[in-house]
A protein has these predicted regions:
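Extracytoplasmic ligand-binding site segments that recognize negatively charged/polar headgroups
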Residues: 1-157
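A ligand-binding cleft/hinge motif common to bilobed small-molecule-binding domains
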Residues: 2, 167-171
Length: 171
């Protein structure tokens, strides 16, 4: 982004440099923006005129059927609900990987394209709120967090019973 701001990178003309999507929507109105201009109107849109997102991923939330109990988690709020679902959680060891989820669990409605959550994360207050939500989970005597960094670890943690729920990579 700095390289774009400093004129070191080439700026895209989205409609000239990229063809329309399979649905016929021109590039400047596409890029997962729901028809809003990705450079000016979309809150979670393109970070600069010199960059195009090329990776789309999701997080998997899993639980151990044998240790979770009769009630099963159904929402991201359940991941943080240690009264209803006591036990440790397995969370990826990255300071930013869990912030969106924490805000959703704390009551911020995602909005179209996650707009409300990303608006909150653009503020110091929103980031602090997300971090506090994760810290509360990790320090909860009914809960706690086990941080992982290798993709095979979440299933291992679940199978061993060390955690009752875990996040995992989608691939």
């Amino acid at each position: 982004i700095n390289g774009c701001d400093e004129g070191l990178f080439v700026e895209f003309d989205f409609d000239k440099d990229f063809g329309p999507g399979a649905d016929g929507v021109k590039a400047s109105d596409d890029f997962f923006t729901g028809g809003k201009n990705p450079l000016t109107e979309h809150p979670g849109g393109m970070p600069s005129k010199c960059a195009v997102g090329n990776i789309l991923y999701s997080w998997v939330y899993a639980y151990n059927h044998d240790t979770i109990g009769k009630k099963k988690p159904k929402t991201v709020k359940d991941f943080f609900n240690t009264k209803k679902f006591p036990g440790k959680r397995g969370i990826y060891n990255s300071p930013t990987a869990f912030l969106e989820v924490a805000l959703a669990a704390d009551g911020i409605k995602p909005g179209k394209g996650g707009a409300k959550i990303y608006d909150a994360l653009r503020t110091e207050e929103g980031v602090t709120r997300a971090i506090n939500k994760v810290e509360t989970l990790c320090k909860d005597p009914n809960g706690g967090c086990v941080f992982w960094s290798a993709g095979a670890k979440p299933p291992e943690l679940l199978m061993s019973g060390e955690v009752v729920m875990a996040t995992g990579w989608n691939g």
